[in-house]
Amino acid sequence: MSKFDLTAKNCQYLDRHLTFPLLEFLLQKNIYDQTSLLKFILETVSKTNMVDYTMDIRERLNMGNELPEELTKRRSNVLVKLKELQTEVAPLMKCMEELKNPDTMKDSKSIVHALQQEFDFKYDIIRSAQKLAKYLYECGNYRDSISYLYICLLVMEPTDKNYLNVLWGKLAAEILTLNWPTALEDLTRLRDFIDNHNFSPIEVLQQRTWLIHWSVLVFFNHAKGRDLIIEMFLYKQLYLNAIQTMCPHILRYLATAVIINRGRRNALKDLIKIIQQESYTYKDPITEFLECLYVNFDFEGARMKLHECQTVIINDFFIIGCLQEFIENARLMIFETFCRIHQCITIGMLADKLNMEPDEAECWIVNLIRNARLDAKIDSKLGHVVMGTQPLSPYQQLVEKIDSLSVRSEALTVLVERKQKAKTQESGEGNWKYY
């Protein structure tokens, strides 16, 4: 299933520490050769200070469980450097502990002024705090790194040349500690900084592309993320432009968010337009599922793509947690679209369209009716589902009628074109044989 695997593309825009969970996930899926993947992880982790993780990978590669002299020396150097940086930063930590209510101060200038007045504070010590935070991060000690990064953000002015690096570091550390509420706050702060800073066009495009990939990790793990990903990726033009220019594969995650978010069906029309525009550069079973269903009205194609979607999602680190929701909502979308064209449906036909057994399909419809999500009746003797109608205002009736006629017209047009194309191919017309 490596054909649809996006790990290599996604990892290009992630910090190396953020790639480790993705690579470990791939190891479990057996999509690639295990030894080659472990060697790649070992090569990547060797660029950090994560000595214990390095040893773990070496053991899994059967390279022995004894610590090589090189790693022993490296661990010793890491501990010495860590002690040195902690000593440098100790005065700042003491000042911050004694400073009253730093969180309530208006801005970094107020905090720096208070520190200078009360503790003879030197701004250069912030550089040491940043180095220590970075060093702890490289050791895999993300929680302690967050503490120092938080202080850096309190004291640093946004004009500081290192401010952007600290914002990125804080977001990465919050993601790696699975602190999603704070990660979302940091994501918003970083996005505001990128959007309002004076970057060159190339720089801002690069920054937005990185932010798009990092934000997927946050959005699919935060309660509000499914709405926020649609707002940012589909309706913030600057980010949509970045997706279309640099990373159209992100459409997989946008499409997934729209499919599982029943309250945002109004976004489907805009999403499908983008998917069609970008289909020449990127497509996968998830984007093709929407095209089959809403562009071609190809229910058989949609059924087959839904089956492929399940395999894609199972092997995608970002969206594997959405699998059941995706299947449920995708089936509902097929059902709703099918019912707009056919008012009376056999359970057998419906089961076929939804990749379900007839008994399972009947039970599924019963649950929809029971949960007041569907106005329909089941005729068990005939094996039919008869769609009901709810009283509508004259205006709503007109809108529904036009909408329904539009859907039916498009479906009929597609069917006629498909049949005509088949006839043309059979007769050999239009092949320009004798040009």
Curated annotation (Swiss-Prot):
PCI domain segment(s): 219-392
Domain of life: Eukaryota
Keywords: Cytoplasm, Initiation factor, Protein biosynthesis
Annotated compartments: Cytoplasm
Signal peptide range in chain numbering: none
Functional note: Component of the eukaryotic translation initiation factor 3 (eIF-3) complex, which is involved in protein synthesis of a specialized repertoire of mRNAs and, together with other initiation factors, stimulates binding of mRNA and methionyl-tRNAi to the 40S ribosome. The eIF-3 complex specifically targets and initiates translation of a subset of mRNAs involved in cell proliferation.
Name of the molecule in the record: Eukaryotic translation initiation factor 3 subunit E
